[in-house]
A protein has these predicted regions:
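Acidic, metal/ion-coordinating pockets
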Residues: 261-484
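Active-site histidine-anchored catalytic micro-motif
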Residues: 2-242
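Conserved hydrophobic/aromatic beta-strand scaffold that supports enzyme active sites
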Residues: 124, 136, 251-253, 314, ...
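Hydrophobic side chains in beta-strands
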Residues: 35, 255-256, 400
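Long, Lys/Arg- and hydrophobic-enriched amphipathic alpha-helices
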Residues: 234-263
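Short, surface-exposed amphipathic charged segments that create phosphate/polyanion-binding patches used
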Residues: 150-153, 244-251, 397-402
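A structure-centric signal for secondary-structure junctions around beta-strands
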Residues: 29, 57, 248, 272, ...
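Short, glycine-/Ser/Thr-/acidic-enriched flexible segments
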Residues: 40, 172, 259-261, 438
């Protein structure tokens, strides 16, 4: 016998699907999604399912909070099927049987009959994956970290290359809009680390209505699929009901994709702006000869655009752009770049802003640096020197350099005055900064960088992009808002 349909009318789902049309290109192998269960935000549920729609799944594992505290154990499941507005969703009785027989923390329950946490997403499962089997898992709001770890170990063997994990979770609850934004930023900080232990710092329901579901999902994806969450939207019930500013609920939509050599660009949705940032960029020195080879140059350009999808790019340009003839006394520590080649490459990569706050802009003196600024501006690029900022629509970008190759002082160049000036610029826009700092070939921040990072955070910076070390960081450090 199946649980009856909780939402019998398909109109709300059809309306949401109409708002989120099918994608023109596949986003890659989607192995997990996190969606709301408030149908006020049904368009966001539809958006995530559209991203997963090209997948061929044999099993869906659905995680959601036990809203009405009906589970007597940390987790509950069922072998019963579900009716929806789009037809039945059948359970994977074999998979459920394995879970119940091997994990005493999981019980069979009737709670699924009335919980909107599962019923809000099942119509989309039936609509997109009508033959896929379901393993539903209700996560008790009183379950603990050790329970979640045990659940991960129980679920992991059931995840194959044809499994989609659907996490049904709403985020900050019962807060005014300003507080909701602060709590969402804290949650985004935790998600950005890609670490399940970061979720443990969040509070329930101030940050989300199921820490357990988020923790289990993050850990499963990391352990089984080597995947981390990508946030594609963060909205609040206020965005749908602008007169209701009290006791809001927020939504953070996430997708997980299996690793790709070159990740497929995700769609840019209404109200969003996607920008990419490139660290040390140069078309001189060691890059000069390879770029003369048309095959190599075309391959490199294709690779870059495959990553960015042609989205606007901000680069830290190392060296001096100049007209020929070049100076005769060139060394590996002085980088010269021809203006024609450099501007052609910047246009091809859709570079919007060029940061010249670094240790190579004075390689050929102040006059050459000034001429470089003129050449780049004449070519149509925004140019930022140390301490300068530019409005790039969705954010304001500030350029800072803590290093120089010339002059008496070559380190510790970012002053307290620079930081105070940042605070004066605090506007409605988020402030991002491109910082030239650190030591070459050292990916970890030293005490100087950590000290600056603390100050930048205190002065309201939302994102700090570092350059100079020639190696990428292994992880993202939370910044912006408060860390929980």
């Amino acid at each position: 016998m199946a649980f009856p349909a909780f939402f019998r009318n398909a109109a709300v789902f059809e309306s949401a699907l109409a708002e989120e049309p099918p994608l023109a290109t596949s986003p890659g192998d989607v192995c997990g999604i996190t969606v709301p269960h408030h149908l006020l935000a049904a368009d966001l549920i539809a958006r995530a399912f559209r991203l997963a729609a090209s997948g061929h799944y044999e099993r869906v594992i659905a995680l959601f909070p036990d809203h009405y505290r009906k589970a007597a154990r940390p987790f509950a499941t069922t072998t019963q099927c579900f009716q929806t507005a789009y037809g039945p969703v059948c359970t994977d009785a074999t998979g459920v049987g394995k879970l119940v027989s091997t994990d005493p923390r999981i019980e069979v329950s009737e709670l699924f009959k009335v919980d909107h946490g599962i019923h809000a997403v099942l119509p989309f499962v039936a609509r997109f994956f009508p033959t896929t089997k379901l393993i539903p898992i209700a996560v008790s709001v009183t379950s603990q970290n050790e329970d979640w770890d045990a659940c991960v170990q129980s679920l992991a063997p059931l995840i194959t290359t044809k499994t989609l994990i659907v996490q049904s979770t709403d985020f900050s609850h019962y807060l005014v809009r300003r507080q909701a934004r602060e709590h969402d930023q804290e949650t985004l900080n935790a998600i950005s680390t890609g670490k399940p232990e970061a979720i443990l710092q969040l509070r329930q329901p101030a940050h989300l209505d199921s820490k357990g579901a988020q923790y289990i999902h993050v850990k499963l994806q990391r352990q089984v699929n080597r995947s981390v969450a990508e946030v594609i939207e963060n909205k609040n019930s206020f965005d749908y009901l602008p007169w209701d500013t009290w006791l809001t609920t927020s939504y953070i939509v996430q997708i997980y994709r299996k690793p790709q050599p070159i990740p497929s660009p995700l769609p840019v949705y209404p109200g969003q702006q996607v920008s990419f940032f490139a660290g040390d960029t140069s078309f001189g020195r060691y890059m000069s000869r390879p770029l003369q080879n048309k095959v190599i140059a075309a391959r490199l350009q294709k690779h870059i655009l495959a990553i960015t999808g042609g989205a606007p790019l901000v680069v830290n340009l190392e060296g001096v752009v100049m007209e020929r003839p070049f100076p005769t006394s060139l060394s590996v520590l002085r980088i010269a770049m021809g203006v024609d080649r450099t501007t052609a490459w910047l246009r091809a990569m859709n570079v919007r802003a060029v940061v010249l706050a670094n240790n190579h802009t004075l390689d050929f003196g102040a006059v050459r640096r000034l001429r470089m600024q003129q050449l780049l501006r004449q070519a149509g690029f925004e140019v930022l020197m140390h301490g300068e900022s530019r409005d790039l629509k969705a954010f304001r970008l500030v350029a800072l350099s803590d290093l120089a190759n010339h002059g008496e002082q070559r380190t510790h160049l970012i002053s307290e005055a620079d930081l105070v000036d940042l605070q004066k610029r605090r506007l409605a826009q988020p402030i991002l900064t491109f910082v030239h700092w650190g030591a070459e070939y050292l990916a970890q921040p030293r005490s100087r960088e950590l000290d600056l990072l603390a100050k930048l955070r205190r002065y309201g910076l939302r994102l700090v992009i570092g350059a100079h070390p020639h190696v990428g960081s292994a992880e993202v450090m939370p910044l912006g808002g408060n860390s929980p």
